[in-house]
Amino acid sequence: APSRHRITDYIQILLWSNCSNTNASTSRKNVALSKADFAKRVANQLKPYTTPAENTLAKEGETVFMNQCVRCHQVNGMKRADGTPVIAAPDENMVSGAAPNLSHLMSRNTFAGATFDLLNKSCREDVWTADSESFGDKYLSGVNEDCLNQKDLRGWLRNAPAMKPMYANPALLTSTGGKYRGMPNLGLTEADIEKLVAYLLTLK
C-alpha cells in the first residue's frame, strides 16, 4: 500500500469557497489533483489579465462589467482606457466588505458561493464521472461556451435575488446605510447580459 508520505506527495487538496459572508453557501468542492495538474492550476491562476479584442461582444461586456460590476467584484489586472487599474470597492458597497473575486471565473465549476453550477449538466457529469487518468485534464479545461450553464448564469445576471434571496435591496435596509447584503438586481438589459456572458467566458 502507498505510504502516507507518498499519498501526500501525490495529491494536493484544493478547497474552493469563492464566497463572502453575504452570498456564501455551505457547499464546498474538494478536488484531488496530481502534483503536475496542481502546478498547471497554479500557473493558470497566475496568468496576467488579457483584455478582449476590440470590436467584439466580449469587449463590450468588459465595459458593462466596469460600469456595473466592479463596485463589488474584482478582476485582477483589468485597466481602464487610460491605463489606470480597475479596483473593486466592496468595502464601500457591501455590508460584509467582501465579494467574490471573478478573476479566472471560468476555471471554476460553480458560482454564487457554490450555489449554482457553471457547467451544464452533461459537461458536469463528464468531468465528475471521469476516471482518475483523465479527470485532471477535464477539470482544468474549465468552462467554454458549449459547456456553460447559460440558464442559471443569465438568470443570476438578470435578477439574482429571485434565485437566491439575500436582502439585496438597500431601500429596505436602512440600518446598512444603503450597503448591499448580497448580489442585487442591477436592472441589466438583455443586451447587457449578452455582452457580460461573452466577457465572463474570457475569464479562464
Residue ranges and their predicted role:
Residues 20, 72-79, 107, 158, ...:
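Detector for the c-type heme attachment site
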Residues 68, 76-78, 86-88:
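Alpha-helical membrane-anchoring segments
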Residues 23-28:
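Extracellular and select intracellular beta-sandwich modules with Ser/Thr-enriched
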Residues 67-68, 151:
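Structural detector for helix-capping/boundary residues
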Residues 15, 69-72:
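Short cysteine clusters
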Residues 34-66, 81-84:
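Electrostatic cytochrome c docking/interface patches
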Residues 31:
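Short, acidic/hydrophobic/Gly-rich beta-strand patch recurrent on exposed beta strands
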